[in-house]
Amino acid sequence: IQSVDDIIARSLKYSDLAVSMGIGAIRTHVDTCDDQLKGVQALLEVKNSVKDYLYLKLVAFHQDGLYRDPSALENTLRALDMGVDIVGGIPHFERTMSDGARSITTLCEVAAERGLLVDMHCDETDDPMSRHIETLAYETQRLGLQGRVTGSHLTSMHSMDNYYVSKLIPLIAEAGVHAIPNPLINIMLQGRHDTYPKRRGQTRVRELRDAGVLIGFGSD
């Protein structure tokens, strides 16, 4: 069982490696499923240790889903109280589509109340009916969070029909929601239930970019 010190040691080692490769800023998702919040404790310590040479921002990420775990919301709020910077979520991992939408509403309201950014693992699936990015764009506008919200992965857009996407992308752009594709991991994870042809599972980068959506590639 890993300790807080174990996580600190690995994270400091990685931070030094990142800086040696010319990286000056990192946004990382810290797991809040652990009731002891060991990862949160560790990465807040690391953030303070590297602040003079690495801009480190932490996302509170309950990867088991906000409504699948009774302690999820409490742990997320505790992590934010401790100093984690950004509100995260994973709506497509909830038990139902409606729970996924509800989780987006709850987490965006938390961010709005606290003046924080949002970074959601959103629609990381091959299911074209996973459309949580639409809800994320709506809540962004409803709560006045334009420019402060990011949808990560967005791989279901690879499988959506073009008619729906022609509506969706303008909504994303209108809301000022940013996109972070993670191509190296999604080319491995997506399409794993396919036979042939296999989907590559990449979101629609060119269409998003052409619509004015700010895009930054990530690594998962």
Describe every region a protein language model picked out.
Residues Y53-Y55, V59-H62, H153:
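Conserved SAM/AdoMet-binding glycine-rich loop
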Residues K38-V50, R68-T150, L154-H178, T195-I215:
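Histidine/acidic residue-rich metal-binding segments in metalloenzymes
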Residues A18, H178, P183-R199:
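C-terminal helical cap
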Residues V59, S152, I180-P183, G216-S219:
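Short, conserved beta-strand edge motifs with alternating hydrophobic and charged residues
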Residues H29-D34, H62-D64, E94, E124-T125:
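Conserved short loop/turn motifs at secondary-structure junctions
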Residues I1-A9, V59-S71, P91-S98:
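Active-site mouth loops of central-metabolism enzymes
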Residues I23-H29, K57-L58, D119, F217-S219:
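Short beta-strand segments at enzyme active-site cores
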Residues I1-H29, L37-S49, E74-D81:
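Alpha-helical scaffold segments that flank or form the walls of functional sites
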